[in-house]
Amino acid sequence: MYEQITRNKWKSFFLVLFFLGLVFALTWFFGELTNLGPQALVLAVIIAVAMTFGSYYASDRIVLAISRAKPVEKKDYPYLYNTVEGLAIAAGIPKPRCYIIDDTAPNAFASGRNPKNSVIVVTKGLLTKLNRVELEGVIAHEMSHIKNYDVLVQTLAVVMVGVIVLLSDWILRTFLWGGGRRRSRSRSGKGGGNAGAILVLVGLILAVISPLIAQLIRLAVSRKREFLADANGALLTRYPPGLASALRKISADKEPLEVANKATAHLYIINPLLEFRGRVNRLFSTHPPVEERIAALEKM
């Protein structure tokens, strides 16, 4: 179990590292293309930091509003409240605030910029359709997302995708407006010749494919964090079959979650939107296949 957790952490780390490398590669080429040099990197960093802070501090309020989640007190759902409180103590973090979505489809998610400002959201369907150990498994999974700062990781990943798309757009527009051609001719005049042309070609190819690569990396990070939350959640309850049974039951439920959309689907323990199967489709999925998650839990 501990080896799987460590392995998932390292995979997530290297994916984010590759993400950063892509951002810096695009920024360097944009600087070369426009003669801005290091100024392009400074500009990209400023934009990334501003977008990150905005998303980071407002993410929980935005998600709660989109999901139409309502806060609950201990007197309303004492078992939910006590379960969250007990698992928070076991995880060593402050108790997250509890919210509920008035929907009969079973599902749940966690949000918040850090453990001190976190929420756990469940649907009414989750409370009525899952038994005690299954509910504990789901809450432990969401608690692990909070403890692992997964909201921060996902926020950074989304922002990096935005920065990469922005840089790619700037590069393509700059080249189409003639900046790239002038830069290429300038290099040729200085003896750059073929090297300058190759640089422009490589940069343009990178600008075209980078948004797709960035999106695939973001989704891969999301899938790895789900595996990590499963493993940590099972470690928290000391009963992996509880979470495995919950995943099986939630994925088998056919009721649609009315408030779900593409902007929030990646947050839920099971993607509430229809996903197509197949090797290619899996690359664009926010979650690992449920069968693989259950199999990993059963091996613990």
Task: Kindly give the residue locations of the regions a language model identified.
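N-terminal signal sequences
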Residues: 23-28
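Polar-ligand-bearing catalytic/cofactor-coordination segments
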Residues: 1-21, 33, 40-42, 47-199, ...
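Hydrophobic alpha-helical transmembrane segments of polytopic membrane proteins
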Residues: 203-210
